[in-house]
Every structure is written in structure tokens, then in C-alpha cells.
Amino acid sequence: NGNGKPGKGKLSQRQIDIIRKKIEKQKEFLRGQIKKSKVTQSEQNQLSNIEQSGAELKVVGQTYTTRYGGTTKGIECVVVKKMTRSLMEQSNFPLTSQRYSSKPEEDTLYSQYENEVLEGIRIGTLLGKKLQVRGESRDTVFNRQLVGKLDKRMVSALGYGNEHVFFTKETDQFKKANLHISVDASGSMGGSKWKKTMMNIVALAKAVDMIPNLSIQISFRTTTNELPYVVIAYDSRTDKFMKVKQLFKYLTPGGTTPEGLCFEAIMKNMVGSTTDMDSYFLNISDGEPYFHGKDMNYSGDSAASHTYKMVKMIEGMGIKVLSYFVADGNYGEESSSGYTFKKSYGKAASFINVTNVNEVTRTMNKLFMEKA
């Protein structure tokens, strides 16, 4: 613009500087680098929200090799361990839209997916009823054994040279199971893909809530202020299902896809398999890993290789990985993104159309009903 003023829709240099200062201040909050000065009420609220949500910065991507063979110093990833309503109301939370001109009786956040959440609860209730057999156990007693516990009813037979007076008991029951769902919350997941995905993850959360030996965590990954961002929105071990019903309707996708960087950031929070627990990691996304931020260009084969390395580390914890590419029209398995997706997840990669996202729920239902 010739008059030195910013063009329509563009930020002035002063506005850019103000935004940069705000971003740096938020990073300092997360790192705990708070300067000793009078804290405003707004800053106090922000600090309180960060503390309640367990937010922290984790350095990730230090093993990432660029397409030219170079290495990076890594990048900080924002990890929010507990999503709260107050955090969602903050302007720097990347997955909600605020109503700035809301009346006192109106909601401060835009609720765009209430119908999908309610439908998910309906489907999940039906699924939960089918899965309730998981909470049952069946004892089978084998009588007249040579070893085992003494069968008191057979004691009198000892005098007649009968040594088959013992019994054994086998209990047939399902192992405990844990499911971590990681959802791609990038902008391209919007529209019908997000609606179908929301319906299915809510259905799984509702079903798990009805079964005593199942647990579930749901995390969303996106970007904020040139950093990867991952938030654990729901953890059935500590949260009540009402949280899903009340808060998930506000979640809206945006940003890019820092896949492997976010997996790396929350890996220590994942639940590994044990002798009495099966663990699953379910990824839902619609494209290849991509993130461009300060000092890092995370894309193409390099990002796919890093993501694959993280997937292998997750599998190394005894966790079964399932990864679904939600395709839209012709943009699927045969596309360049489909190729990169396969490279990122290997044998764990599956392709589904936006019209049959319910396949995710059916697959988990089948896995939950398997016995070791």
C-alpha cells in the first residue's frame, strides 16, 4: 500500500509486534519463566488455567532428519494434560470459537456439533450394551482330578483306593483394555469428516463408560502460535463422561498436522500393555504429517519417517496401533498424501471414506470382544 498503511485484511507492523510479544509471554508462562512484576487479572486467570490444565512445553523432533539430511534442534510442543472449560474460553485455545458479543444468558462459545455428540451417545449406548459381556466371568470346575484342591464330597472315596478326589477351577474372563484415540484436528478435517469423527469418538467414549474393565483417553492435535499443540480432552480414569457431553460440542478443527511430533510429546502418558491389560492406540486423520513453524519444516518423506519411528516406539510399549485415513472423494489411498500416510503408519494404515467412518467403531468393538 503506497500510503504506508496496511492493506485491507493485513496486519500493521505494530500489530504483528504486539502479537509476537503475546506469543512469547504465553511461552514464558508455560516454561514457568514468570518475571517478578505486577500481574494483571487477565494474566492471573491465564496462569490459573494453565495450572489447572497441567499444560507444559516438551521439546520434540530432536531426532527429525530434514529432506536434505540435516538435523534440527527440535521444537517445543504444547502439551495440555487436562482440557477444562475455562481453558477452552481462553482466546489462545486453538480448538474453540468465542462469541465476543454474547449476551449474559448466551453461551460464550460456539456450539457447532451438539447433534453429532448426541447421536454419538445414542450409538455408544447400544454398543455399550453389546460389550457388557466383557464385565462377566465364567467359572468351569473340573472334578475327579489327581491334583488340585481337595473335593470334600469325595473324601469318603479315599478309603476305596480312589485318588481322583481333587478339583481345579478355571475362570474365563476378558482382560482389561485401554484405548487412546488421537484425533487430527487440522483445518482440513472440517465439515462432514469432523462430524462423522466426532460421532464415532463420542460413541466409543460412551460405550467404554458402561464397561468396568475398559478405559479410554481422547487427545486432539493441532498447532498454535507456530508450535505443535496436543490436548488430552478426556480420560475416563479421572473424568466423568458428562465432560464429553458438555464440552466436545464446542471443539472445532484448525491448524496443521504435526503428527509424529505430537505422538512423541505424549508417549510417556500412554498406557502400555501388561499381562492383564491390552492396550490400543487409534489414530484418525485425513492426510500426511505436515507442520511448518519456527526453525522447522516438517513435511514429506522426512516427516513420514519420523512419524513411523514414533509409531514403532508406541508399538514397542506393547500397544497395538490402528491408523485410519479419512478420505473425501478421490483424495485417498492413491493420492500422494495416501502414499505418505502408508509410509507413516506401515501395516497399521487403513483407508476409509467419509461415509463409512463407523468402520472405526466396528473395528474397536471386534477387538474389545477378542480374548487372549
Tell where the protein language model's regions lie, with residue ranges.
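C-terminal helix of von Willebrand factor
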Residues: 343-372
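Short, contiguous acidic/charged loop-to-helix segments that flank catalytic cores in large enzymes
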Residues: 188-195, 248-258, 269-272, 290-305, ...
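Extended acidic, low-complexity intrinsically disordered regions
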Residues: 1-3, 8-11, 27, 190, ...
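Negatively charged
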Residues: 1-179, 192, 243
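VWA/integrin I-like adhesion module and closely mimicked acidic/polar interface patches used
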Residues: 267, 287-344
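Von Willebrand factor
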Residues: 171-284, 316, 322-332, 359, ...
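Secondary-structure transition/capping motifs at alpha-helix termini
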Residues: 206-215, 271-277, 313-317
